[in-house]
Amino acid sequence: FHAWSTSENLNELQLVSSIEFGKAPANNPRLSRSLLLELISSMPEEGWFGIDEFVGYVHDLQPDILRRAGEYDAWFIKDSETGQPLIGFQHWREIEGWYVQMMIQGPFTWFGLVDLGKSAEAKTSMCFRRSRWADTLLKGRAPEYPTTESRNFILDKNGHIIIDRYFPRDIRYQVARFCDWDAQKGNRYEYRI
């Protein structure tokens, strides 16, 4: 996470597939990333936030996240489907808005900074929340994962097996192959022979 967040060489703006550039974008990817990470770190730890609402929040609070000093007419950008030029501040949502959305649904999710959510009918993510690792990652530390595997399980006289989630994965796989799935209760998986 630290290597990515401080990189000058990775430019996520080039991952926004809905836009094309006449020449390489003259943005500062590290600064843009840093500004977005600051906004994420200032958000409440609990609750879900609409991606569109967050894009609007960035628009109101930090509109120059990509094109610094009002360079809205200086970059030659066009819509990749229609070829229409996207010049001027009126196209902020198509450029900066898509960038913010892509960062949430892409790198912020890939690195475990945010969790995504959507309704059953939606095709793409509609909301996000800070993950349980967000504070740790934003402070430059690696998240802690369980280091020890559980060796405890229950096998009762009725052929009911209860295995802890942290039981060795290869053994859980074998149990799942020869048993019928029963239920998951918290961090425990239940099977029946």
Which stretches of residues belong to each language-model region?
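Extended alpha-helical interface modules used as scaffolds for assembling large macromolecular complexes
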Residues: H2-I193
